[in-house]
Amino acid sequence: MDETTVNGGRRASDVVVFAFPRHGHMSPMLQFSKRLVSKGLRVTFLITTSATESLRLNLPPSSSLDLQVISDVPESNDIATLEGYLRSFKATVSKTLADFIDGIGNPPKFIVYDSVMPWVQEVARGRGLDAAPFFTQSSAVNHILNHVYGGSLSIPAPENTAVSLPSMPVLQAEDLPAFPDDPEVVMNFMTSQFSNFQDAKWIFFNTFDQLECKKQSQVVNWMADRWPIKTVGPTIPSAYLDDGRLEDDRAFGLNLLKPEDGKNTRQWQWLDSKDTASVLYISFGSLAILQEEQVKELAYFLKDTNLSFLWVLRDSELQKLPHNFVQETSHRGLVVNWCSQLQVLSHRAVSCFVTHCGWNSTLEALSLGVPMVAIPQWVDQTTNAKFVADVWRVGVRVKKKDERIVTKEELEASIRQVVQGEGRNEFKHNAIKWKKLAKEAVDEGGSSDKNIEEFVKTIA
């Protein structure tokens, strides 16, 4: 399939930004692209055909970001396994990306690529272009995975193992990144991000200095002393962070799906009717598939409690709910298949975020001052949960007695600790502190703003 355009003819660009075709990777890199545009760069955001089929792009008409599409349709049938898909993706996209660059009369000066696609650097440099990786995980997770890549750390670690890494708090085995499915393939995929780390002139991290440069964890400082790392986050729409410095930047402009307008309106009417800090917001991201037993345990807790809740549950997960749960809890609960998470987290009625601790969700909660109850599932979420509970002190991590599920009783103990327990004031105080520091980082003259400005000056 030939390259196509999303918003008109192909325009000359200073920078091409290319994300791996998954929602959690594209959203922060799309937001980073908007920041570059706001500082005067001409930016092309490159997406693949599979992304256009699974995601809704809805940038405002005023956006000057150039969206272009290249094919990732596999040339082989070897995509039944994750390993086969990744191999086919690399083979196909290496070629279509090269063709895209070759087809530009006035080529860009720079490519910013998703760090999970390190081979993009080879494609770029083969055509005389500079390239830089953009890491969508926290600095702490990058630090851990880099040590795994270098051979000084093995994952999974034996139970009850204490892990000490430079400029990090002591970690237990349960705090390390977890790869329950296809562990060898996923591990290789995640650690390959560091295969050409030493060759980059710029390395972008979606975090902010204050968040990972405090006493318990100075990992940004430690890594920046060794590599050209620049923090550029949080990559969240301007309306929620720096008082709308970016025009019309009220949403990511990228959704997995969108409900009917009537249903969307009902969510906000329902939230508006609730008291301040009275609603639990529950969401486990776009990829997590919970065991039916786990969904039921959470439902049993919500049914028996007196707390109001907004629960985002994909259509494929609804069948796991107990019979008549939605009807029996409708007087104080709402179950939806989609919502604007930023709008929900910024609503005065929300008291707590029950989350899987994906990095985007964690950053959004920190940036909007919302305490968390962490129920991590896999990959980086376990490490993020450790920092939420023990380093940033903005919530708790649910303790499991059974490795398979979190019970109703364990959920109740953790959630009540955050919304009603003695520590609730500390959690909220810390959440507000991080909200303030996140805003300062991206505001004019803040640490992330300065780093972006420095990059722009080398390109313009």
Swiss-Prot record:
EC number per UniProt:
2.4.1.350, 2.4.1.-
Do you know which Pfam families this protein is assigned to? UDPGT
Binding locations of UDP-alpha-D-glucose: S286, C339, Q341, W359, N360, S361, E364, D380, Q381
Q: In which pathway does it act?
A: Secondary metabolite biosynthesis; terpenoid biosynthesis
- In which tissues is this gene expressed? Highly expressed in young fruits 15 days after anthesis (15-DAA).
Its catalytic activity? mogrol + UDP-alpha-D-glucose = mogroside IE + UDP + H(+); mogroside I-A1 + UDP-alpha-D-glucose = mogroside IIE + UDP + H(+); mogroside II-A1 + UDP-alpha-D-glucose = mogroside IIIX + UDP + H(+); mogroside II-A + UDP-alpha-D-glucose = mogroside III + UDP + H(+)
Which molecular function term from Gene Ontology is one that the record holds? quercetin 3-O-glucosyltransferase activity
Taxonomy, superkingdom? Eukaryota
Q: Which UniProt keywords apply?
A: Transferase
Q: Does the keyword Transferase apply?
A: yes
Keyword Transcription regulation among UniProt keywords: no
Catalytic residues of the enzyme: H25 (proton acceptor), D114 (charge relay)
Similarity remark: Belongs to the UDP-glycosyltransferase family.
Primary role:
UDP-glycosyltransferase involved in the biosynthesis of cucurbitacin and mogroside tetracyclic triterpene natural products (e.g. siamenoside I and mogrosides IV, V and VI). Cucurbitacins have cytotoxic properties and exhibit deterrent taste as a defense barrier against herbivores. Mogrosides are nonsugar highly oxygenated compounds used as high-intensity zero-calorie sweeteners; they also possess pharmacological properties such as regulating immunity, lowering blood sugar and lipid levels, protecting the liver, and acting as antioxidants and antitumor agents.
**Miscellaneous comment text of the record:** Mogrosides, the major active constituents of S.grosvenorii fruits, are a mixture of cucurbitane-type triterpenoid glycosides that have been proven to be powerful and zero-caloric sweeteners and can hence be used as a sucrose substitute for diabetic and obese patients.
Task: List the protein's name.
Answer: Mogroside I-E synthase
Q: Which organism is it from?
A: Siraitia grosvenorii
